[in-house]
Amino acid sequence: MAAVWRWFVPERPSFYDRGLLALTFSLMGIGLMMVASASIKEGPGGDMFYFTKRHLIFLFVCLGIGVGTLYLPLERWREWSGRLLVGALGLLFAVLAVGRTVNGAKRWIGFGFFNIQPAELAKLALIVFIASYLVRRSDEVRGNIAGFVKPLAVVFLLAIMLLAQPDLGSVVVLFVCTFGLLFIGGAKLVQFIAIIVAGLSALAGLIIYEPYRLRRVTSFLDPWADPFGSGYQLTQSLMAFGRGGFFGQGLGNSVQKLSYLPEAHTDFVFAILGEELGYFGVLVVLFLQLLLAMKALQIGRTALLRSKFFEGYMACGIGIWFSFQTVVNVGAAAGMLPTKGLTLPLVSYGGSSLIAITMAVAILLRIDFERRLDTSHVIQREAA
């Protein structure tokens, strides 16, 4: 216990947020454990640990990319914000041109062993771009409708490419992050009301237009009306939670993962966690996810108070992204929201999601590091 206490409360000031690092590694560890358990019947060729080995490789790749991101000065992100967005648009276009189709959706670009899902990288690229835009055009955003609409035009362009895949879940994430950042940036409330009404109308139209989306919504409202058809996945997920009780069936003892619950190691890994670790495990993971999002928002608030607006907007955008995606994934697994195909941050299987989220965490660590470094320099100057 003493060693743990010294880790979180070091005797000498630390130049990085140990709590954020501990949260990240804890969620990664839980994710590896649950992917190993949930995917044990899914591997091709009879390899029970196929997805576990791939997930472990993804984690090592993520750590390498995270370290590289940590060494990148934040000013570079600001300088490259436009190029990152153009790169994300290029990758989304490439998906439509040469992407792989899985379960009726064309969302991945195949590179042999590894498939890239550009939608995950587009989320981070958009947050960086919007943060840069708010710094460059802060008066315009606060003063007139044009400054509010311009970033939304960028999101609409991304949304068109994502809907062609189709990937409505990522579109919703992009709009929520953009609205959140515009609100923090000082946009007028009346502008939000008008755009939100228009957005909800468009969302309803998209749901009605595509039969599979309409089936998802109707099955979410009453999954037991068609438990072996459109409501099958959700009813199996609810049964997993029901079997888990308070303390679960024990790690590895899930029944629903045995070919009953589709996508058990990706979109519905939270349901398997509930079955094996019970509501106790569910609360632990939700608490860790809440702390992760709060850490991001706290880092953002501190940066904004110190007039580090680009860094503050980026951190707040990342916090909104993490929290909203967690709510949607958990809500879909628990039958409170329609399924959207979004991962549970740092827990679900998926290399592109892990890479994007690890890069985002590394950016948070870098923001906090530069803040601590500035504070240290101020103290040294005052002492001199």
From Swiss-Prot:
Pfam families: FTSW_RODA_SPOVE. One of its GO terms (biological process) is peptidoglycan biosynthetic process. It is a multi-pass membrane protein. The keyword Cell wall biogenesis/degradation applies. It catalyses: [GlcNAc-(1->4)-Mur2Ac(oyl-L-Ala-gamma-D-Glu-L-Lys-D-Ala-D-Ala)](n)-di-trans,octa-cis-undecaprenyl diphosphate + beta-D-GlcNAc-(1->4)-Mur2Ac(oyl-L-Ala-gamma-D-Glu-L-Lys-D-Ala-D-Ala)-di-trans,octa-cis-undecaprenyl diphosphate = [GlcNAc-(1->4)-Mur2Ac(oyl-L-Ala-gamma-D-Glu-L-Lys-D-Ala-D-Ala)](n+1)-di-trans,octa-cis-undecaprenyl diphosphate + di-trans,octa-cis-undecaprenyl diphosphate + H(+). Pathway: Cell wall biogenesis; peptidoglycan biosynthesis. Its main location: membrane. Belongs to the SEDS family. FtsW subfamily. This is Probable peptidoglycan glycosyltransferase FtsW. It comes from Tolumonas auensis (strain DSM 9187 / NBRC 110442 / TA 4). The gene is ftsW.
